[in-house]
């Protein structure tokens, strides 16, 4: 990943965090890493953990096309690891935030 892509990713995550806070979410963790992958944002709302993938672009393709079954499987393994590491077992869901040209689309409880 180049420097520009890295900085764009941080900018996208910052925008997503501001959006989530306005929606009443508590941000618990950013960029949680495991040997299986990474979760961009872990947040909580109404006692439900939200594991949120952020996709950010300024190009002319659909951002949601960059999330496939393989990536979702990595996210699920990372969620399992997060639960084990923190000794918790709570309700959770996987969400997707797509940011394209400063427009935020929030897709809740995604699956394949």
Swiss-Prot record:
Cystine pairs: none
SUPFAM superfamilies: Restriction endonuclease-like
Pfam families in the cross-refs: UPF0102 (PF02021)
Domain of life: Bacteria
GO MF annotation terms: nucleic acid binding
Record-stated family: Belongs to the UPF0102 family.
Protein's UniProt name: UPF0102 protein JJD26997_0163
Native organism: Campylobacter jejuni subsp. doylei (strain ATCC BAA-1458 / RM4099 / 269.97)
């Amino acid at each position: 990943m180049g420097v520009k892509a890295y900085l764009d990713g941080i900018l996208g995550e910052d925008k997503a965090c501001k959006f989530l806070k306005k929606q009443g979410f508590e941000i618990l963790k950013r960029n949680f890493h495991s040997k299986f992958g990474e979760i961009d944002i872990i947040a909580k709302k109404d006692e439900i953990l939200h594991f949120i993938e952020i996709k950010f672009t300024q190009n002319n393709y659909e951002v949601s096309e960059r999330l496939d079954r393989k990536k979702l499987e990595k996210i699920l393994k990372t969620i399992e690891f997060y639960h084990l590491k923190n000794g918790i077992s709570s309700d959770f869901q996987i969400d997707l935030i797509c940011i394209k040209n400063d427009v935020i689309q929030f897709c809740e409880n995604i699956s394949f």
